[in-house]
Amino acid sequence: ILLVISFFILLEFNFKSLVLGLLSVPFVILYPFMKRITFFPQLFLGIIFSWGVLIVSMQFNTRITFDFLLLYFVCIFWTLAYDTIYAYQDRSDDVLNKIKSTAVYFDKNGKRFVQTCYLIILIILSYFVWNSSNFLLSSIIIATIAICTYIAIQKWDITSPLSSNYYFRQNNIFAIMLFLLLQTF
């Protein structure tokens, strides 16, 4: 049903955006099988979930611009980070059932992987901050994002499903701060 609704929304877009949107369909169909194929289904999910950024760029610019490509990578790394945190909730079941995920792959090094994802996000966002017309406000917001993310990752206990669920849900706060940051550009 969601795919049909998405298709009707896509019909309102220009031709290039429509084609780009349709190119995502095979990936959407393949995604459920990724946990059997690769230890990085979160990456595949990030590529699919973030596809809309490319469609928006195509709709408004008739091409994929550098800034939108950077934003696409921000979204991919964010999905990698939050879905890895989510995957730690049922990591033991995944190992038992031979289901692959970044949580299974990175095991006790999951925090380091998630930290790296958020660091890449902050580096890319710094490019936007540097070029922002509202440098002071965007600097304050990105500093807040960095501090809050650092504290959350330090407190996250990868061995606790409850902790993983809590810090997965904390990504709502990250989303709000990211939204506020994007408003300053």
What are the residue ranges of the model-derived segments?
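Multi-pass membrane catalytic core of lipid/isoprenoid biosynthesis enzymes
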Residues: 1-21, 77, 96-136, 140
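Residue-level signal for inorganic ion chemistry
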Residues: 41, 90, 171
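Cytosolic, membrane-interface loops and tails of multi-pass inner-membrane proteins
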Residues: 1, 83-107, 154-162
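Extended hydrophobic alpha-helices typical of membrane-associated regions
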Residues: 127-185
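Small-residue-rich segments of transmembrane alpha-helices in multi-pass membrane proteins
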Residues: 45-58, 105, 168-182
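Residue-level recognition of pore/gate-forming positions within transmembrane alpha-helices
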Residues: 3-4, 25-28, 49-50, 75, ...
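Alpha-helical transmembrane segments of multi-pass membrane proteins
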Residues: 28-32, 74-82, 86, 144-151
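Intramembrane alpha-helical segments
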Residues: 1-70, 127, 150-157, 162
